[in-house]
Amino acid sequence: IIRDGDANSNIITRFDEISKLLFVKLYAEQNGENIFERIVFENDNMYFERIQEAYSSSVKNAKITIPPTFDRILLPIDTLIKCGNELCKINISSANCDVKGLAYEDTIKGTFDKSDNQQYFTPYQIVNFMVEIMSEYLQGTVCDPACGTAGFLTKVGDVAPLTSLLGLEVDERLAWVSSLNLLIHGNDSFTVRALPNGGSLGNEADSYFGKIDCIITNPPFGSDYTDAGILNKFSLGSGKTSRRRGILFIEQAWRLLRENGTVAIIIDQGVLNAGSNLDVRQFILKHFKILAVIDLPDTAFMPYANVSSSILIMQKAAGKVEQPLTFFAKSQSVGRKSNGDDDIVYSNTGSPSLNSDLPD
């Protein structure tokens, strides 16, 4: 409907408007209203303005932070009316949280996966595995300091509903998407903050130092950070003109965690074996207990990226570090083809399953 009604829209702007409509509908339903149902004698302009006012009101009263650029629905009148005609037929709040969450996640996947925006999206197969393998550490405050669309945090909320969830994100749009994703999943103990000045590597994240119990994240490890003011805050960045963001996230995870807190982070394998990253390995050995290293196949993030990556699981050491026995594994398949589609195999009886050696 939105694509047909607004020729100037693109997949991202359409997603933004869908999210706004879902938000105002959810907010109204919590107050027992079917906001998109027509009122007697209401003409098109009156209907349009009422929905706009309802959205503005819900934005002001919401528990989540919404960027100023998202303070108004940008759909043309006729398109908003057509969307409203469809939305008034359903009650989102009465649906099971799992169903609502899966539906919105599918919309997110269609927007951010297999497109120019894929850098914001971690494949669900890897999300599920990392959260499940970290399940015994999911307590207190669980943070994703590069939360993207909140894939990790929504899964943590499903597995460990008593945790307090914290998402940090440099992009305002993604912070808003994360908040709505968590809200639709039925989470009520979460905070998502947009940190536009350097993201969680910038000064705005300092207030969270030493307060996080567990971190699960897939930072943008393939890009360089060049802000000298920020680089000099890090022992792994001081005196350098640039450093890989993923490397800085390792040090920042150490700062964010409480003593004995744990982190599961996806890293470029160059961190583990490149000569230029010797200082990173020395930092890890000095400050963390290495619990596990799990190599991922090169297809794990294709087609957006063809990179050798690993999941590194560590515990922030309290005092002198004595390295424990470390679990090492190499995955050959994560249930994802090189084009980004699910890699499905069939048993002798015809039952489908993901072609993945990651345990359920």
Can you say where each PLM-predicted feature lies in the sequence?
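Short acidic-aromatic active-site loops that bind/stabilize oxyanions
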Residues: S93, D116-P123, G239-R243
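Conserved S-adenosyl-L-methionine
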Residues: D116-T217, G222-D224, I267-G270, V280-R281, ...
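A conserved structural/catalytic subdomain of Rossmann-like adenosyl-cofactor enzymes
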Residues: D6, F209, D213-D360
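An alpha-helix initiation/capping motif
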Residues: I12-K20, F121-Y124, N128
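Short amphipathic alpha-helical segments and their helix-coil junctions
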Residues: I1-N10, K82-C88
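Generic structural signal for well-ordered alpha-helical scaffold segments
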Residues: R3, V131-S135, W254
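Structural motif
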Residues: D4-I18, S93-D98, T241-S242
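Long recognition/docking surfaces used for binding and targeting
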Residues: I18-T111
